[in-house]
Amino acid sequence: GYVNGLNAAEETLRENRSSGDMDGSAAAMRSVSHNGCGHYLHHLFWRCMTPNGGGGEPTGDLRDRIESDFGSYEGWEAEFREAASWPAGGWALLVYDPVTKQLRNLAVQKHNDGALWSAHPILALDVWEHSYYFQYGPDRGGFVDA
């Protein structure tokens, strides 16, 4: 899985730095990006899906910020659903972008393609088929609605 891939890549980089032989370092760095992002996004996704993950509409500061940055909660939700609906699968993310000091929705493929540098994920929805197909079949929209 992602943790094993990340750990193996980190070990390769440590060994290469120690020996001075950089053969394989470029592939290991790509593996750190792919497996690290895969691990971090799944970790956030499962935290969001737990009973303590909240559920329902946000309240307080997060709700206020969504309304400020997207115009309304409904506007944010419609855009987030669009991020989750692209045919290639991947991730729909609500992130905080410290450069623009705004919340943004992102559609990210392959864990790290389409990521926004410096953005901090707040909400992650895994829309790869393995996340919904067993329960929802090809109805990704039903999974997103749930």
UniProtKB/Swiss-Prot annotation:
<dbReference type="Pfam" id="PF00081">
    <property type="entry name" value="Sod_Fe_N"/>
</dbReference>
<comment type="function">
    <text>Destroys superoxide anion radicals which are normally produced within the cells and which are toxic to biological systems.</text>
</comment>
<dbReference type="InterPro" id="IPR019833">
    <property type="entry name" value="Mn/Fe_SOD_BS"/>
</dbReference>
<feature type="binding site">
    <location>
        <position position="126"/>
    </location>
    <ligand>
        <name>Mn(2+)</name>
    </ligand>
</feature>
<keyword id="KW-0560">Oxidoreductase</keyword>
<dbReference type="InterPro" id="IPR019831">
    <property type="entry name" value="Mn/Fe_SOD_N"/>
</dbReference>
<dbReference type="GO" id="GO:0004784">
    <property type="term" value="F:superoxide dismutase activity"/>
</dbReference>
<protein>
    <recommendedName>
        <fullName>Superoxide dismutase [Mn] 2</fullName>
        <ecNumber>1.15.1.1</ecNumber>
    </recommendedName>
</protein>
<keyword id="KW-0479">Metal-binding</keyword>
<feature type="binding site">
    <location>
        <position position="42"/>
    </location>
    <ligand>
        <name>Mn(2+)</name>
    </ligand>
</feature>
<feature type="binding site">
    <location>
        <position position="130"/>
    </location>
    <ligand>
        <name>Mn(2+)</name>
    </ligand>
</feature>
<dbReference type="Pfam" id="PF02777">
    <property type="entry name" value="Sod_Fe_C"/>
</dbReference>
<comment type="similarity">
    <text>Belongs to the iron/manganese superoxide dismutase family.</text>
</comment>
<dbReference type="InterPro" id="IPR019832">
    <property type="entry name" value="Mn/Fe_SOD_C"/>
</dbReference>
<dbReference type="GO" id="GO:0046872">
    <property type="term" value="F:metal ion binding"/>
</dbReference>
<keyword id="KW-0464">Manganese</keyword>
<dbReference type="InterPro" id="IPR036314">
    <property type="entry name" value="SOD_C_sf"/>
</dbReference>
<dbReference type="InterPro" id="IPR050265">
    <property type="entry name" value="Fe/Mn_Superoxide_Dismutase"/>
</dbReference>
<dbReference type="InterPro" id="IPR036324">
    <property type="entry name" value="Mn/Fe_SOD_N_sf"/>
</dbReference>
